[in-house]
UniProtKB/Swiss-Prot annotation:
<feature type="short sequence motif" description="Prevents secretion from ER">
    <location>
        <begin position="312"/>
        <end position="315"/>
    </location>
</feature>
<dbReference type="Pfam" id="PF13202">
    <property type="entry name" value="EF-hand_5"/>
</dbReference>
<feature type="binding site">
    <location>
        <position position="166"/>
    </location>
    <ligand>
        <name>Ca(2+) 3</name>
    </ligand>
</feature>
<feature type="binding site">
    <location>
        <position position="201"/>
    </location>
    <ligand>
        <name>Ca(2+) 4</name>
    </ligand>
</feature>
<feature type="binding site">
    <location>
        <position position="278"/>
    </location>
    <ligand>
        <name>Ca(2+) 6</name>
    </ligand>
</feature>
<keyword id="KW-0325">Glycoprotein</keyword>
<feature type="binding site">
    <location>
        <position position="83"/>
    </location>
    <ligand>
        <name>Ca(2+) 1</name>
    </ligand>
</feature>
<feature type="binding site">
    <location>
        <position position="212"/>
    </location>
    <ligand>
        <name>Ca(2+) 4</name>
    </ligand>
</feature>
<feature type="binding site">
    <location>
        <position position="164"/>
    </location>
    <ligand>
        <name>Ca(2+) 3</name>
    </ligand>
</feature>
<keyword id="KW-0472">Membrane</keyword>
<feature type="domain" description="EF-hand 4">
    <location>
        <begin position="188"/>
        <end position="223"/>
    </location>
</feature>
<feature type="binding site">
    <location>
        <position position="81"/>
    </location>
    <ligand>
        <name>Ca(2+) 1</name>
    </ligand>
</feature>
<feature type="binding site">
    <location>
        <position position="128"/>
    </location>
    <ligand>
        <name>Ca(2+) 2</name>
    </ligand>
</feature>
<keyword id="KW-0732">Signal</keyword>
<dbReference type="InterPro" id="IPR018247">
    <property type="entry name" value="EF_Hand_1_Ca_BS"/>
</dbReference>
<feature type="binding site">
    <location>
        <position position="253"/>
    </location>
    <ligand>
        <name>Ca(2+) 5</name>
    </ligand>
</feature>
<feature type="binding site">
    <location>
        <position position="168"/>
    </location>
    <ligand>
        <name>Ca(2+) 3</name>
    </ligand>
</feature>
């Protein structure tokens, strides 16, 4: 059972840092590409299909006729129209694309859900999570494995409260997803930065200096000479990370490092799909406009929409 995801992540980080001193640990979170294919609508729409449905889902479209594709695309459109006003806006399309690209995250949450939802009420309370994750450890105030579980639990509780949007100490699936994968949510970015700084800031001054920055990536105890990438990272810190040149990174500088403002591929694709399909140029799409351009969205392919719609309903 996957009942201790954060504990396992912590333990793996420790092993990583101590067992492979020459390998670089990367804390930077980048968005995955929408598709591995070229975006060339002059040749085909495969990139758009992958972006709209997710690359794995798009592979299962091959056996559907155009009529079946249009029918099932119509059902998808109803799901995208979040406010049910009969139109699909660029923002709604962007949100759908982002969700399609995060399928692996939702699958991970789904696998863990049943282990924590002890009373089967389709919610996970902090007490449920705490009891499953830390119950046996808290019975021993001084475990011999070197981990401070009370400290780790307090950190998890702080993150849980941040993910719990309505403050009821109970998480629905979207809130629990934000708890397990905070880097994917705008309102959770501050907690990602805070946890990163707590991990790296060894002297407790609230900043990350050069030696702490390098020490987090590289364990030099067993080596005479530093690998070349370490020297490069020292330069990166001085030239780019430490923007105000005070010799350390503050919260804003740390956020720029680990959560860079990457090019928003989902937004660009949403703009592209609206531009190509919006025949009356009112800035939003009707179901008819989307179905008229079904080849752009799904072509003569389509996902196993029965499965897809059930999965998206759950979230």
């Amino acid at each position: 059972m996957e009942i201790r995801p954060l504990l396992m992540c912590f333990a793996l980080c420790v092993v990583y840092a101590t067992s492979k001193p020459t390998e670089k640990k990367d804390r930077v979170h980048h968005d995955a590409p929408l598709s591995s294919k070229e975006h060339d609508d002059g040749t085909n729409f495969e990139y758009d299909h992958d972006a709209f449905l997710g690359e794995e889902e798009a592979k299962t479209f091959d056996d559907l006729t155009p009529e079946e594709s249009k029918n099932r695309l119509g059902k998808i459109v109803e799901k995208i129209d979040a406010d049910e006003d009969g139109f699909v806006t660029e923002a709604e399309l962007k949100a759908w694309i982002k969700k399609a690209q995060k399928k692996y995250i939702y699958d991970n949450v789904e696998r863990q859900w049943k282990d924590f939802d002890l009373n089967n009420d389709r919610m996970i309370s902090w007490e449920e999570y705490k009891n499953v994750t830390y119950g046996t450890y808290l019975d021993d105030p001084e475990p011999d494995d070197g981990y401070n579980y009370k400290q780790m639990m307090a950190r998890d509780e702080r993150r849980f409260k941040m993910a719990d949007g309505n403050g009821d100490h109970i998480a629905d699936k979207e809130e629990f997803t934000a708890f397990l994968h905070p880097e994917e949510y705008e309102h959770m970015k501050d907690i990602v930065v805070l946890e990163t700084m707590e991990d790296i800031d060894k002297n407790g001054d609230g900043f990350i200096d050069l030696e702490e920055y390098i020490g987090d990536m590289y364990n030099h105890e067993d080596e005479m000479d530093e690998p070349e990438w370490v020297a490069t990272e020292r330069e990166q810190f001085s030239e780019f990370r430490d923007k105000n040149k005070d010799g350390k990174m503050d919260r804003e500088e740390t956020m720029d490092w680990i959560l860079p403002a990457d090019y928003d591929h989902a937004e660009a694709e949403a703009k592209h799909l609206v531009y190509e399909s919006d025949t009356n140029k009112d800035g939003k799409l009707t179901k008819e406009e989307i179905l008229n351009k079904y080849d752009l969205f799904v072509g003569s392919q389509a996902t196993d929409f029965g499965e897809a719609l059930v999965r998206h309903d759950e979230f």
